[in-house]
């Protein structure tokens, strides 16, 4: 990458001049997308000769490992080396490796869709369109040049502790969180620490206005860092309601009989997207293509849903019973380019409002 490893993520993204337009993470079309490719015996044999695929991901480790083991079971002779860390670290690691001409990773996943815009602009991703992506993915969830597609989708939601809040008294909207009865009872994550919450904060200030956050700040909220923290505080009963946080954590807790319940705000819930892509100079190109086809195919997507509590845009993936289908939920519109363009000002304004 033509970047300096010491630069911050946002400085690198701003310097890239990345541009998005309209769709979840559509980028300016620079070339025609390649034709869709099915999984063939020739590809499988070539992948087996390579013997390995290296996967950098920000997906929760148990979910990433389940995906890897399922792939290995389907394609014996090919191992998956999972390197899991946060999205920020994934981005920094790729930048450091490529600036040193080290090509160690095959397939990458990040919970920050804007990373893929940078990698694409730097010319280090390779086009590859799995057959199932071409057939079953909406246009807005695949790069028009075929360089990445939505591997996982989730929401940042409101939720409450069912031991502390009766269903009929629970908030139904973001506006409800401003009711004085919730003062001192709300937990919230920080956009300065969490990419998920930065994305959610951008969407919420765009749709609800900064006045919402100014009023929320008067509610004496518990401020935490990661998007995984509000569900934990909720589960422990340290707060009755969370204003934001990962939907998938709430699913996992609820299905483990923990006292939590999701709420889908009437104004819409922020939508978060985490794509997958393949690097052009990867060491195992055939194994990378086979793994990408598996991860983005129905089998990999169903595993994400069942094990990870995640959503999928694959048209044939089945929602898990007991969860509200994504198609029935009003969501806010994702715009990674705007998040990166306005990220520093969003963070600064948030800090001023909440004094944290």
Place the predicted regions along the sequence by residue.
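A ligand-binding cleft/hinge motif common to bilobed small-molecule-binding domains
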Residues: 114-118, 240-259
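Periplasmic-binding protein-like
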Residues: 153-154, 182-192, 214-217, 223-224, 256-282, 295-318
């Amino acid at each position: 990458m033509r970047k300096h490893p010491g630069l911050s993520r946002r400085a690198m993204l701003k310097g890239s001049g990345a541009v998005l337009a309209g769709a979840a993470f559509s980028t300016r079309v620079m070339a025609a997308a390649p034709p869709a490719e099915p999984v063939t015996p020739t590809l499988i044999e070539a992948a087996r000769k390579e013997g390995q695929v290296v996967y950098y991901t920000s997906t929760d480790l148990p979910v990433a490992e389940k995906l890897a083991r399922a792939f290995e079971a389907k394609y014996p002779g090919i191992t998956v080396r999972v390197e899991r860390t946060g999205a920020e670290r994934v981005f920094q690691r790729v930048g450091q490796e490529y600036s040193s001409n080290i090509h160690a990773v095959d397939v990458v996943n990040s919970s920050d869709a804007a990373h893929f815009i940078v990698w694409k602009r730097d010319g280090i991703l390779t086009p590859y369109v799995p057959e199932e992506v071409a057939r079953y993915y909406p246009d807005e969830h695949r790069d028009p040049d075929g360089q990445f597609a939505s591997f996982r989708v989730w929401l940042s939601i409101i939720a409450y502790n069912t031991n502390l809040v009766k269903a009929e008294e629970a908030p139904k909207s973001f506006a409800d969180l401003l009711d004085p009865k919730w003062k001192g009872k709300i937990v919230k994550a920080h956009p300065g620490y969490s990419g998920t919450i930065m994305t959610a904060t951008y969407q919420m200030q765009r749709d609800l206005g900064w006045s919402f956050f100014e009023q929320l700040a008067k509610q004496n909220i518990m401020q935490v860092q990661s998007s995984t923290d509000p569900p934990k505080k909720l589960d422990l009963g340290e707060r009755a309601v969370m204003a934001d946080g990962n939907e998938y954590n709430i699913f996992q807790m609820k299905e483990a009989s923990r006292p939590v319940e999701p709420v889908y705000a009437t104004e819409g819930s922020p939508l978060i997207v985490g794509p997958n892509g393949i690097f052009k100079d990867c060491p195992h190109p055939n194994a990378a293509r086979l793994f990408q086809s598996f991860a983005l195919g129905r089998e990999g997507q169903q595993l994400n849903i069942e094990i990870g509590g995640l959503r999928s845009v694959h048209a044939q993936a089945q929602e898990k019973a007991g969860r509200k289908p994504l198609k029935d939920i009003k969501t806010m519109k994702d715009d990674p380019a705007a998040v990166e363009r306005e990220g520093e000002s969003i963070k600064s304004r948030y800090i001023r409002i909440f004094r944290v």
